[in-house]
Amino acid sequence: MALSVGTTAPRFTAQDSEGNPVSLSDFAGKTVVLYFYPKDDTPGCTREAQGFRDSYTEYQNKDAVILGVSTDDCTSHQLFKQKYELPFTLVADPDKSITKAYDVDGGGYAKRVTYVINGTGVIDQVFTTVKTDTHAQDILAGL
């Protein structure tokens, strides 16, 4: 069961695709779209990532940050980002600590769930049913 609207988003620090540290607190004051997905370079996950890529400018115009999280490692994320020219940050969670903190552990992978976190670190929206082809636009409509 995913975390609820109104809950303070769990803080985390992990590595991005380049091995650099990334923390939720790095984006204080901004809307963060924290999207969890099962696996790099698989059909549904690729469509979802491409949707965020194609809408990236619209997210920037709304001062929103996109963070994609899966249990893949940094190298896998780096290859996925390069292959599909993804302009946003992918967060590696191989130890599943973030996945578990956000209650989206699918038993070895992250469930496809998205949290919209406001600038004060509170969850404003939760998407537990995701249509990978339209998900990025569905979220934008509510920002």
Report residues per predicted region.
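Chalcogenol-based redox active-site neighborhoods
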Residues: M1-L143
